[in-house]
């Protein structure tokens, strides 16, 4: 029992997705900031945003899949988890853009 708790604690301490997540979200943030600075319209942003940070997204997605597979998740479950995490990040930064361009 104690060894199981120690193993779980070690897994929780080692966030294998942290670097990839930070790189991906930093890229999204930079894209949003540059889009706001360039005074892009919502339509321009919406057209360009899905292609932004593609390499960083792929690296993050693969890191999430590796993490989940290491925790004995199924491949399908790991892919679904990765898709949800990517979608959450993209929605978050898309909403930041919308808030930044909305007149107060």
Model segments located where?
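Short N-proximal segments of mature Sec-exported proteins
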Residues: 17-63
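Compact alpha-helical subdomains of small soluble proteins
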Residues: 46-104
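Signal peptide-directed secreted proteins
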Residues: 4, 40, 66-69
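Classic N-terminal secretory signal peptides
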Residues: 1-15
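Generic N-terminal initiation segments characterized by hydrophobic and/or small/turn-forming residues
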Residues: 2-5, 25, 42, 81, ...
């Amino acid at each position: 029992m104690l060894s199981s708790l120690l193993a779980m604690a070690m897994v929780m301490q080692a966030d294998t997705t942290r670097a990839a997540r930070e790189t991906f979200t930093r890229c999204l943030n930079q894209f949003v900031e540059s889009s706001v600075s360039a005074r892009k319209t919502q339509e321009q942003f919406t057209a360009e945003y899905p292609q932004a940070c593609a390499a960083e997204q792929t690296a993050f997605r693969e890191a999430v899949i590796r993490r989940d597979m290491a925790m004995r998740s199924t491949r399908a479950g790991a892919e679904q988890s990765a898709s949800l995490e990517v979608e959450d990040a993209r929605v978050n930064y898309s909403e930041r853009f919308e808030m930044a361009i909305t007149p107060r």
